[in-house]
Amino acid sequence: MSASADSLAAAASLDKYGDEDIFSLLIRYGLYVGALFQFVCISAAVLMENNPDVNSNPETGEVTEREGEPVRTRLHKIRKLEKKKRR
């Protein structure tokens, strides 16, 4: 019995994580809260991506696709109009 008690005492003295102070608890639970927040944000981004926006306005800078007009020229026209508006 004495040998097992001695080995337990030796193991307890080698345990450097036995006593936790407030700072280590704060770090641990802060990491849990941060991970939960990231999970919620990523899941919201994935779920919101599939929902179509019903109030989309093409004049807010979004480029909608038209037939026969390439994207590059449309972007150029939008920039040109914005430059004229600033004059």
Swiss-Prot record:
Transmembrane feature ranges: 25-47
Region (Disordered): 52-87
Coiled-coil stretches: none
Main location: membrane
Entry superkingdom: Eukaryota
Membrane association type: Single-pass membrane protein
Keywords attached to this entry: Membrane, Transmembrane, Transmembrane helix
Gene Ontology cellular-component annotations: membrane
Amino acid composition bias (Basic residues), ranges on this chain: 73-87
Biased composition (Basic and acidic residues): 63-72
Subcellular locations according to the entry: Membrane
PANTHER family per record: MANNOSIDASE, BETA A, LYSOSOMAL-LIKE, MANBAL PROTEIN, PROTEIN MANBAL
Homology family: Belongs to the UPF0239 family.
Protein name per the record: Protein anon-73B1
Organism: Drosophila erecta
Lineage of source species: Eukaryota, Metazoa, Ecdysozoa, Arthropoda, Hexapoda
